[in-house]
């Protein structure tokens, strides 16, 4: 199972952004570095959901281009994307499965259906969704 790490403040930013955009799905991109231990998310991009829908999202192409330019300028690698599920579990929906095609990307899904948010991460390998191991950490407790 692939490990994908993220600082706690980045996770908090994703949760807050997703809650601010309820009842719509919130979405964005992830950038960072790849190491022998796995992936390290160093920057989260918050993009507009062009569909403004509760059950799917479309990333704004202009926002995507700006994010990619910023990644290049900061020598970060695109690692994948993230989106929220306002009222469904943190697992790929039928729509997520239909649209996912990049085996190099991580797909983080944040569920807001319960009292406490649930984050899972996946990647697609030969059309099969495989779970990753997302690890949220603070500077004091890196693992």
Predicted feature locations:
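Short, well-ordered beta-to-alpha junction loops that form the rim of enzyme active sites
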Residues: 84
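Conserved beta-strand-loop surface patch within small alpha/beta domains used
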Residues: 1-78, 87-143
């Amino acid at each position: 199972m692939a490990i994908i790490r993220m600082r706690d403040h980045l996770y908090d930013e994703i949760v807050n952004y997703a809650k601010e955009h309820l009842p719509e799905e919130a979405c964005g991109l992830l950038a960072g570095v790849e190491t022998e231990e796995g992936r390290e998310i160093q920057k989260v991009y918050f993009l507009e959901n062009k569909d403004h829908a509760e059950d799917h999202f479309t990333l704004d192409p202009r926002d995507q281009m700006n994010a990619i330019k910023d990644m290049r300028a900061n020598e970060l690698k695109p690692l994948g994307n993230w989106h929220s599920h306002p009222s469904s579990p943190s697992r790929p929906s039928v729509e997520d499965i239909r649209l996912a095609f990049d085996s190099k990307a991580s797909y983080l899904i944040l569920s807001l259906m319960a009292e406490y948010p649930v984050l899972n991460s996946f990647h697609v390998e030969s059309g099969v969704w495989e779970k990753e191991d997302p690890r949220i950490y603070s500077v004091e407790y890196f693992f």
